[in-house]
UniProtKB/Swiss-Prot annotation:
Cysteine pairs bridged by disulfides in the record: none
UniProt-listed GO biological process terms: symbiont-mediated suppression of host cytoplasmic pattern recognition receptor signaling pathway via inhibition of RIG-I activity; symbiont-mediated suppression of host gene expression; symbiont-mediated suppression of host mRNA processing; symbiont-mediated suppression of host PKR/eIFalpha signaling; symbiont-mediated suppression of host type I interferon-mediated signaling pathway
Name this protein carries in UniProt: Non-structural protein 1
Main subcellular location: host cell
Domain comment as written in the entry: The dsRNA-binding region is required for suppression of RNA silencing.
GO cellular component, one term: host cell cytoplasm
GO molecular function: protein serine/threonine kinase inhibitor activity; RNA binding
Motif mapping: Nuclear localization signal: 34-38
One Pfam family of this chain: Flu_NS1
PTM remark: Upon interferon induction, ISGylated via host HERC5; this results in the impairment of NS1 interaction with RNA targets due to its inability to form homodimers and to interact with host EIF2AK2/PKR.
Functional description taken from the UniProt entry: Inhibits post-transcriptional processing of cellular pre-mRNA, by binding and inhibiting two cellular proteins that are required for the 3'-end processing of cellular pre-mRNAs: the 30 kDa cleavage and polyadenylation specificity factor/CPSF4 and the poly(A)-binding protein 2/PABPN1. In turn, unprocessed 3' end pre-mRNAs accumulate in the host nucleus and are no longer exported to the cytoplasm. Cellular protein synthesis is thereby shut off very early after virus infection.
Region annotation (RNA-binding and homodimerization) ranges: 1-73
Amino acid sequence: MDSNTVSSFQVDCFLWHVRKRFADQEMGDAPFLDRLRRDQKSLRGRGSTLGLDIDTATRVGKQIVERILEDESDEALKMTIASVPATRYLTDMTLEEMSRDWFMLMPKQKVAGSLCIRMDQAIMGKNIILKANFSVIFDRLETLILLRALTDEGAIVGEISPLPSLPGHTDEDVKNAIGVLIGGLEWNDNTVRVSETIQRFAWRSSNENGGPPLPPKQKRKMARTIESEI
């Protein structure tokens, strides 16, 4: 096992612990708490994959961070912060929409790279909007936190989420996953729109109504793909 992989996991565990202590003081905002929950799932998945105990990794991660901070001057810290590009966190969904459990009558699921696509294929003839919470850097999607498909009534009928055991995805991965989700939902005569935020950073739809920029023939092909593979 690569030593950098192990030490990276150990540092991530300790930094998560610090963020959790901060949240326990009731000082974290909604995006902060949202990332905290998602990162906890990711760390559990990575720990299982690596065969490492999280508590032990956290203690070792603390030692690594302490050694770094001992050698870090205030001036070097300022320069480091100034050189790091700013990441923006964009939220379509409320915390309630993000955390709400949902159930499928006809569950369908597909794993595409490090993303999991889920949908309820019992849903027919509904108006559906895709909403997402994600981070952006250099005006491009950096990390998808969660994307969900909601009906006009607010019911959740589909989602795209990162797999905790397979961290890392590109904006192109997210775009492809959105196409698969839309194709599957439209197969059942649902009308699907995407939020303005998703259009701008993850989908770049040319349809002013928020629909996907796919010709009908390609939509049908994509729908058949999801029908056979999910």
